[in-house]
Structures are given as C-alpha cells and as structure tokens.
Curated annotation (Swiss-Prot):
Residues 72-169 bind DNA. It comes from Caenorhabditis elegans. The gene is let-381. Residues 19-70 are annotated as: Disordered. The keyword Acetylation does not apply. InterPro entries: Fork_head_dom, Forkhead_box_regulator, TF_fork_head_CS_1, TF_fork_head_CS_2, WH-like_DNA-bd_sf, WH_DNA-bd_sf. The keyword Transcription regulation applies. This is Forkhead box protein F. One of its GO terms (molecular function) is RNA polymerase II cis-regulatory region sequence-specific DNA binding. Residues 37-57 have a biased composition (Acidic residues). It comes from the Eukaryota. PANTHER family: FORKHEAD BOX PROTEIN BINIOU.
C-alpha cells in the first residue's frame, strides 16, 4: 500500500500531460541563417559588378583593336612581294619600294600594325622564288641602301592563273625538267629519229600468242623425235607471226634489241642476232647444286651468244607436258637434259652453232 500511494502522489505532483501543436520557437537560429545569406548575396553582387566592369573593358579593347587593324588582303606574302616586283618597269625592287607599293595599294598595311614588315623580310630572304641581285657601281646606285630583288625565271609560272592566291604551308617552287629526246608518252628519239615502242605487253594480239602456244604444244606432243632446224623454224615463224612493234625507223638501219632498250647497227649487243629482229627464248643462267637441293639434279645453264634456237626438253606424256607448261621445267625434264648428250652432238653435226653448256659442280 505504501508503494501505490507514493506513485499516485508523484503523478499528482506532475499534473496532466498537455499536447501542444505549435512548433518550437527557433527564432535565434533563423536570425543567424538570414544574416549568413545576406552576407553571401552582398559578396556575389560585388563580384558580379567587378566581372561586368572587366568584360566591358575587354570588349572596349577588342573594339579598339578591331577598329585599328583592317582586314588582311586575300593574298599570301609571297604573292604580295611578287606583285610589287612585277609592277616595276625593270622587274626589280628594293625592300623599301616593296613596302611603299603595299602601303599605297592595300589599306591593311597603312594601319598601326607593323608586324607585316617582318613577314615581308622573312619571305623575301628565305623563299627560292626571289633572287637577290648584287649592287652595281653606277650613278643610279650611288647613295642607295639595300639590294634589289627580282623574281626567278623558274618561278614565273606562279604569276599565271591565280598564282597570287595563298598556297598551302611548306610550298616550294617546282623546277621543270625537260627531256629533249622524248616527244610523247610512247615515243623515243634516237639520233634525230623518233620511234614508237609499246606501252605494255597487252598490245600483242591474242591470235598471235594463241598460235604460238598451239605450235609449241604440237611440237612437244610429237615425242621430240625430230630435233633440228624444223623446230627452230616453226618456233621462229610462230613468234614472228604475232603482231609486234617495228624496231626499224624510217630510213634508218636495223635496230637490234639489247638489255637497255634499242641497239644500233654500228654497236649491236653481243647476244643480239643479226638474222632476227626480236629476242628469243633462253634458259636463265642459274645453276643448282644437288647437295644443297636433294632430289634435284643440276640443271644446265645456257648462255645465249648468236644462236636463236630454243631446245625444248623431251617429254612423252601430255600430263607431264601440262605440268611443265604451267610451272616451268620439272625435275624429269631437267634429267632429260642431262641424259641427252647424243642430242647435243646430233645438233652440232647438223651444222648449227653449239650452245655452251655450263654445269655447276659442287
């Protein structure tokens, strides 16, 4: 009972609880925040005012500069110098005369900006289009300072067809190269005469090349029993049947082919044949070593001298012929060369000039 009376007396002392919907009073905090924002606004206004004043000054400065400097002419400094020199009667001008010409004809050079003078001197002294002339000892040169400048003869083409316009950076004058011997794209002059030469191998007719392939195929498919002048005659007739460009000029001696283009009758190349006017087919001067290439026998090397004959290998089957026709002489054909000593002997006794055979021995 004593505990309950103590609790009741404490509740009576506290009194009933009251719920108030009003917000607590935070007036002191609000005052501090208002003062803080007011200070920030004052600083911002001061800074913006200063920025606006600076921008006004900058705009006024730019306006002054834009009013002082005129628009630059649509020409490069090289073109301006060339114009000043070309307007002179003697096509020669000093640096002072170039300055005066530019100031008289262009408003840009009459302003307060003086940096263009350095650009004129720089382009005048470093460009290959302008030549500095030495001083002469005469009355006209007495008391005058500076050298005269003129335009180089190799750069006069720049003055034609809008040559005064600005060119890309790093431009240099191109020197013209003349070739007196060549009169056209497909002509060559030799000794005062002009000869045409084929621009490409496609100018040969298809009929001539097809007839050559057919004749060679028929000869090789016969088994290679008859090797003599008949084969060479057929091959030469087949090659000459193709339409090839003429090597004989009008009223000129026969021209023989050589390694470097056209030969002459007085100085023909050693391997050029006086009988035929077109190169013949020959085996390249290459020797093989059997130790370095196992399975392949050494191939003979044929050095053409005066004989225009072409000796095909003895091939008996059509399949081996097609393989050799596509990929060159095979190992079997090379072996046929080695085993055909009697064939070479027969050719020698027939009255033809023997072709030297050089075998590379290891």
């Amino acid at each position: 009972m004593e505990c309950s009376t103590a609790i009741y007396s404490l509740a009576n002392a506290l009194g009933p609880l009251k719920l108030d919907s009003t917000a607590p009073n935070n007036s002191h905090r609000t005052i501090k925040a208002e003062n803080y924002f007011n200070e920030d606004e004052e600083d911002y206004n001061e800074n913006s005012h200063e920025d606006s004043e600076d921008s006004k000054e900058d705009s006024d400065g730019q306006g002054c500069r834009s009013r002082k400097r005129k628009e630059k002419p649509p020409f490069s400094y090289i073109a301006l110098i060339a114009m000043a020199i070309s307007k002179r009667p003697d096509k020669k001008a000093t640096l002072a005369e170039i300055y005066s010409y530019l100031q008289e004809n262009f408003e840009f050079f009459r302003g307060e900006y003086a940096g263009w003078r350095n650009s004129i001197r720089h382009n005048l002294s470093l460009n290959e289009c302008f030549v500095k002339l030495p001083k002469d000892t005469g009355e006209s040169y007495r008391g005058r300072k500076g050298h005269k400048w003129t335009i180089s003869d190799s750069c006069e083409f720049m003055l034609e067809e809008n040559g005064f316009r600005r060119r890309p950076r790093g431009y240099k004058a191109r020197k013209r190269t003349h070739f007196p011997g060549v009169t056209a794209s497909n002509e060559m002059g030799i000794g005062g005469a002009t000869f045409d030469y084929p621009s490409s191998t496609t100018e040969l007719t298809d009929s001539g090349t097809s007839s050559l392939n057919t004749d060679v195929k028929n000869i090789l498919l016969n088994g290679g029993e008859d090797f003599g002048p008949s084969i060479s005659d057929q091959l030469v007739s087949s090659t000459t049947s193709a339409v090839l460009p003429s090597l004989n000029g009008p009223d000129q001696s026969p021209i023989y082919p050589n390694y470097f283009g056209y030969g002459t009758a007085e100085f023909p190349m050693q391997w050029a044949s006086p009988t035929y006017d077109w190169p013949y087919y020959a085996t390249p001067h290459i020797g093989l070593c059997s130790s370095d290439f196992p399975g392949i026998s050494p191939s003979p090397t044929v050095t053409p001298q005066v004989s225009p004959y072409f000796y095909p290998p003895a091939i008996t089957t059509a399949s081996s012929f097609m393989d050799d026709w596509r990929f060159g002489v095979s190992s079997a054909a090379v072996g046929a060369y080695d085993s055909s000593a009697s064939f070479l002997a027969a050719e020698t006794t027939a009255g033809d000039v023997a072709i030297p055979q050089d075998l590379s021995d290891c």
